[in-house]
Structures are given as C-alpha cells and as structure tokens.
C-alpha cells in the first residue's frame, strides 16, 4: 500500500457517488425518487454523495432545484453520511452564493469545479477559489479539475497556494492521468486528499497516493468498488487487481458517450426510473443501450 494513502486524510470517506438527478415523465426533478436512490447508494457502500455535479446535470438545473435536491438528499441519508453539493460556476459571485447556500442547507462539503468557458489564468483561478473559501470558511471544499469539460486546468502549484485556506481540503482529479496525483503530492504533500474522478483510474491512482474516488459506476457496483478499495488498502493487491479488471467493461460502457447519458440508461435497465437527461443531452441510442444491457448482464454473472 502506498504510504500516501496512509498519511493523507479522508475528509469525505473513500467511496463517493456522483449522484444522478432523477427526472419524472414531465422532466421535473423527482425529489422522492432522489431520496430513495440516495439511501440505496449508501446501503450499497457509498461513504458520501455528491449532489448536482457533472453526473447530476448541474448545468441544466436551476439553483432553486439544486438547493431543493440537496435538502432532500441530506434528509434522506441522515447525519452519518457525507453529502457534498456541486456549487461551481464560471461566475465567482454565483459560486460564492451557491456555496454559502449549500452550507446553510446542511452540506458537509462543496465540490467546486474550475470555471469553464472563460478560461481564467492561474492567478484568476486562485483568486476565484480563494474568494469562495473565504466566503464559507466552515465548509470543506473539494476543488474539481476536469479540463476536458472546462477548457482550462488548475495547476498543482496553484492548488498548493490555495491550501493556505484551511477549508481547501481535497481535490477531484479528472484530467485522465495518474501524473496529476503525483504532481499534487509533490506540490501539496499529504495534507491534500486527492480523489480519482475516473472509475477506471481508481486503482492506479490509489497506488500513487489518491485516497478514494468520486464514482459514477458506484450507482451499479458500489459494493465491488468498496471491496476493491479495501483490498488495496489491506495489502491484497492481486484481489484489488481482479476487481479492477472485472469492472473495466462497465467503466468503458458508462463513458461510451457523454456522462451521464449511459449511467441513467443503466439505472433504467436496473429498475430505477431516473428518466432521460435534460436537453441538450439525449437518451442513449438503441444500439448503445443494447450493448450496455449486455455488459450489465455479463457483470451479473461474474
């Protein structure tokens, strides 16, 4: 086991589910189903839930819908489960307002994505995150780097400076490379809890110092992901690797097109009527849906 995994804190546990947002037949947020899904995910091994992140379709939810959903999930899972709110925006003022509101609703933390579209320089990113941290000093923050969606990347050196803010405690690494974890470790040491933002890279990232994952696949295989993490942490590398290899077909199937299109289809196929994504996202096309169904069937047999 990596010494980094031993030394780094785990402020939100090790397995967090980036929760989908259920919609009813009219396209409205299905709050009752969201509460049931949240409880199910916890029962299946999630230490915490991320509400209204990328997988939760935050770009097409109003802030009112997001705050309502957060409140319902918070109440559904009770105080023993970590609930993080996606509060990022490319407007610093909006992100501050969303983050302070999330704290008031009862979030245990905020997932704050790098500002998208306007592509700030590193100095602007630092000022943006510092302003959010200072506006909600009691709320732990998880910085979220996903350059494939945002168009810019938060540099490890910038993260190191932001750790002057006591509530900057964690980082979701979704750049698609394990080197991001290594560079964060070199710049920030072991105090920063780095979470993989990619199910397929969870095991490699654990080996270089990540502490866990913000997962999409845990909607479907939470217990297996938890078992893989525990096997790695207990020094059972071969067992962890067997889980990693067993789950690869599902990891790939869930990203055959834009997230959360496939995972919502997978949940529908598994008996959870979470509805289609909101436009401009579309339901999974029939050919991909059939392939996904076959993947799920095969997984049930292993």
Swiss-Prot record:
GO CC terms in record: cytosol
Residues forming the catalytic site: 144, 172
Site (Part of a proton relay during catalysis): 54, 117
Oligomeric form and interacting partners: Homotetramer; dimer of dimers.
A molecular-function term among this protein's GO annotations: 4-hydroxy-tetrahydrodipicolinate synthase activity
Protein name, entry field: 4-hydroxy-tetrahydrodipicolinate synthase
Domain of life: Bacteria
Pathway terms, separated by semicolons: Amino-acid biosynthesis; L-lysine biosynthesis via DAP pathway; (S)-tetrahydrodipicolinate from L-aspartate: step 3/4
EC number: 4.3.3.7
Cell location: Cytoplasm
Keyword Lyase in record: yes
Record's keyword terms, sorted: Amino-acid biosynthesis, Cytoplasm, Diaminopimelate biosynthesis, Lyase, Lysine biosynthesis, Schiff base
Catalytic activity, reaction form: L-aspartate 4-semialdehyde + pyruvate = (2S,4S)-4-hydroxy-2,3,4,5-tetrahydrodipicolinate + H2O + H(+)
Family from the record: Belongs to the DapA family.
Chief location: cytoplasm
Binding positions for pyruvate per the UniProt entry: 55, 214
Species lineage: Bacteria, Bacillati, Cyanobacteriota, Cyanophyceae, Synechococcales
Natural source organism: Prochlorococcus marinus (strain MIT 9313)
Matching NCBIfam families: dapA
Coiled coil segments of this chain: none
Swiss-Prot/TrEMBL GO biological process terms: diaminopimelate biosynthetic process; lysine biosynthetic process via diaminopimelate
InterPro entries: Aldolase_TIM (IPR013785), DapA (IPR005263), DapA-like (IPR002220), Schiff_base-form_aldolases_AS (IPR020625), Schiff_base-form_aldolases_CS (IPR020624)
Described purpose of this protein according to its UniProt entry: Catalyzes the condensation of (S)-aspartate-beta-semialdehyde [(S)-ASA] and pyruvate to 4-hydroxy-tetrahydrodipicolinate (HTPA).
